[in-house]
């Protein structure tokens, strides 16, 4: 304030009530601190992914999540990609004696650039910051396949067919993968984006360690079986609705599966033939014809629902 007054730049001074932010984990006051950071021109990178979704080259399932995607992408701001952390992909930038920046693939390449600029050998200091984790994650669809080298795996598996993800990271992860895929390979990284529900506790609250409401799936599997948990989650996987998971629901589907298992055991006891065959059986008894027709109709409905990502209906 004294400096502003001395420069005659202070217009007004008054008391204000402020909301003081505290860290979730540390519990201490968060103080804003201006520092130099690296930024990415996200607006430029967002153009092609937006076109891809609008032209239906990339589809969201359910379609309603397109609105969330467009809302983020149409209002995107410069992306701060540097982080002051101990672990991560270190930013490939080195500083000369006068803070001149040299960006290179490795230190050897940076030294060559610096020598060319200064006309002599100089000591370089590497930027200590690392990349934002979502920057690294955005490279996942092709970095895992050997990129930047062109090889069999990259040609065969990029782009992929389906990405399965939660709605809470559409912007943080999905959008970044789309931006990098279009920028570096000129192809959408995936054709369909299936946005599944969040699994919450029985009261609809988001699970967190701090709340103490985390349901351990391994304990549910140990107690009620993996099939019971799978059946529960699939039956509740209605598009656009979160899952309110409780042990009672898992127990109920376990009991239902027990009935199916008992029916199967009954057929085995009566020496029913379960040999796999592609041949259509010859059926003469009317009731068996009806059973077979119902089976084929059910099979077709299940296959269509799975293709349409309606796992709850399947």
Task: List each model region and its residues.
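Short, glycine/acidic-rich hinge or "gate" loops at secondary-structure transitions
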Residues: 89, 187-193, 268-282
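A generic membrane alpha-helix/interface feature
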Residues: 45, 154, 184, 243-245, ...
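Residue patterns forming the tRNA-binding/recognition surfaces of aminoacyl-tRNA synthetases
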Residues: 1-98, 205, 211-256, 261, ...
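Alpha-helical recognition segments enriched in aromatics with Gly/Pro capping
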Residues: 84-88, 92-241
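Short, solvent-exposed positions on alpha-helices
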Residues: 172, 188, 251, 309-314
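Generic structural signal for alpha-helix starts
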Residues: 61-62, 159, 281, 285
């Amino acid at each position: 304030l004294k400096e502003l007054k001395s420069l005659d730049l202070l217009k007004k001074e008054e008391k204000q009530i402020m909301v003081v932010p505290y860290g979730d984990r540390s519990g201490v006051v968060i103080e804003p601190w201006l520092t130099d950071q690296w930024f990415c021109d996200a607006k430029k990178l967002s153009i092609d992914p937006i076109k891809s979704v609008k032209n239906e080259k990339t589809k969201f399932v359910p379609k309603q999540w397109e609105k969330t995607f467009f809302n983020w992408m149409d209002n995107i701001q410069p992306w701060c990609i540097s982080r002051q952390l101990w672990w991560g992909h270190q930013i490939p930038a080195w500083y000369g004696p006068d803070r001149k920046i040299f960006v290179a693939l490795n230190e050897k390449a940076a030294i060559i650039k610096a020598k060319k600029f200064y006309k002599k050998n100089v000591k370089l200091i590497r930027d200590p910051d690392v990349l934002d984790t979502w920057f690294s994650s955005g490279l996942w669809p092709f970095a895992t396949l050997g990129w930047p080298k062109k090889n069999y795996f990259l040609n065969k598996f990029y782009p992929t067919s389906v990405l399965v993800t939660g709605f809470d990271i559409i912007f943080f992860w999905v959008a970044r993968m789309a931006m990098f895929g279009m920028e570096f390979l000129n192809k959408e990284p995936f054709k369909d984006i299936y946005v599944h529900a969040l699994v919450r506790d029985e009261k609809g609250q988001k699970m967190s360690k701090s709340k103490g409401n985390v349901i351990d799936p391994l304990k549910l599997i140990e107690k009620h079986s993996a099939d019971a948990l799978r059946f529960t989650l699939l039956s509740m996987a209605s598009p656009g609705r979160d899952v309110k998971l409780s042990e009672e629901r898992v127990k109920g589907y376990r009991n239902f599966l027990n009935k199916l298992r008992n029916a199967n055991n009954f057929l085995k006891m009566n020496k029913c033939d379960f040999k796999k065959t592609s041949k259509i059986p010859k059926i003469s008894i009317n009731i068996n014809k009806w059973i077979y027709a119902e089976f084929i109709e059910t099979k077709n409905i299940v296959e269509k629902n799975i293709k349409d990502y309606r796992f709850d209906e399947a």
